[in-house]
Amino acid sequence: MILKNISIINYKNIKAANLELSPKINCLIGHNGVGKTNFLDAIYYLSFCRSAYNPIDSQVIAHDENFMVIEGNYLDERENVENIFCGMKRGTKKHFKRNKKEYKRLSQHIGLIPLIFVSPSDTILIEGGSEERRRLMDVVISQYDPSYIEALSNYNKALQQRNALLKMEEEPDVTLMEIWEQEMARNGELLFQKREAFVKELIPLFQQIYRHISGDREVVSLRYVSHCQRGPLLDVIQRDRFKDRAVGYSLHGVHRDDLEMLIGDFLMKREGSQGQNKTFVLALKLAQFDFLRRTVSSTTPLLLLDDIFDKLDAQRVEAIVDLVSGANFGQIFITDTNRDHLDRILHESDGNYRIFHVEGGNIDLAHEE
């Protein structure tokens, strides 16, 4: 999928932008805090119906403005044009349309425009809690498996209902409790199977890319951990119902799954240096891109690279440049404060690129070939 052009109105600090884009490499240059990341986030929004950073939709509307609009025209592999529109006013729900027709459910849109976003905040995958790593799995799998989205929604609904029963002062209805436990188990087993299969396929891709970037300096891996590995999920959930009642929430289930990130036999969060951590998450995201490219056979994902070169040594930067300049990558958006990094990528490219200068939310074409 190729984003041909994009129009943005009142999205964060971008008051107005109307840009024609390169089908290969698009570079955005500017100081920190001028709007480069906000531009990438607007592209992300058109793929996922939400911001990568702001959980509340109204937070993306520019200050002192009452509405925002993002509209993009995409070209698929058959050269069909897909028009994607999102508009929202403060205090009302957003409108999301494909070719002028509004979606009944936003989940119907997920996966149409596969995308991987690599940003400095990705280090939270190593440093943060397990919810960040579960979200990583959810975001990728949801882009190629609609049944996963449905199972995840059903599981979370059942979990919420069971937790509400656990919090009750009086003794909850056992029959009702069992209904929600069965719903959790049924959907949870499906989520476990799909996560397990995804991680199994992702590991060799991830290790290969990490070796390329690091120059074979370290051995890394991933380990998926789930309560489903202890036996049938329904048994695991019901086994400690008394403890769950005492704390007021569900202690077991796939909502507690984790994706352990390892260097050698140790957790990255304890052993990894700053450069190793950044290399790890970058390789992980690029492996997700490669996985989606192989899995979603009808289209190549968009790749957003936000300030990825900071805190990496020259050898790793060179390896990344070599990697993303290859034929396996489709349309790429790259931001940086340092023009030198981008020039090296452009030198390796086939010459099809555009450079945009960003300042104070204004985005202007600086150069194209």
What positions do the PLM features span?
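Nucleotide-state sensing region of NTPase/ATPase domains
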Residues: 48-126, 130-132, 138-144, 148, ...
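Structural recognition of the conserved hydrophobic beta-strand(s) that form the central parallel beta-sheet
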Residues: 72, 331-338
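Conserved lysine of the Walker
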Residues: 36
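Walker B catalytic acidic pair
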Residues: 306-308
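Conserved NTPase motor "head" modules and their coupling/switch loops across ABC/AAA+ ATPases, GTPases
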Residues: 1-31, 175-186, 190-302, 311, ...
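An accessory alpha-helical subdomain
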Residues: 124-214, 225
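Post-Walker A helix-loop "phosphate-sensing" segment adjacent to the P-loop in P-loop NTPases
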Residues: 44-56, 287-295
